[in-house]
Amino acid sequence: MTGAHFKYDESRDTLYITFVPGKKATGIALNDQLLLRVDKATRQAVGITIFDYSYLAQPTAIGVRSLPLTGLTELSTELHELALEILQKPPVNAILLLSAYSPSVTETIPITLLQTEMLVTA
């Protein structure tokens, strides 16, 4: 992935991904492990912080690990829509694949999975 800067802090098991170095950003907690950093004025991703990275990057016995985006429910409508917009376009969608879990016909929960193959080649 061109243009992205990766920094792994082994002692904290945290991966920092920066798309626009030095740019001030608003942090949006997608859940306890994922922090999306955005420029609200330009509606662009500035970076992603992935906590517990080594755990999240490991597949389970039945496949890749999906994470509910529980933090979206706590956002204002404006930030919720901005986060979903940014998650669905480059460069973020090359790292986090957005999907939906539907436990019933009336409920949809946004989830994501970490596309580790993109990080290995970066």
Region locations from a protein language model:
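Active-site and channel-lining beta-strand-loop segments
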Residues: 8, 32-53
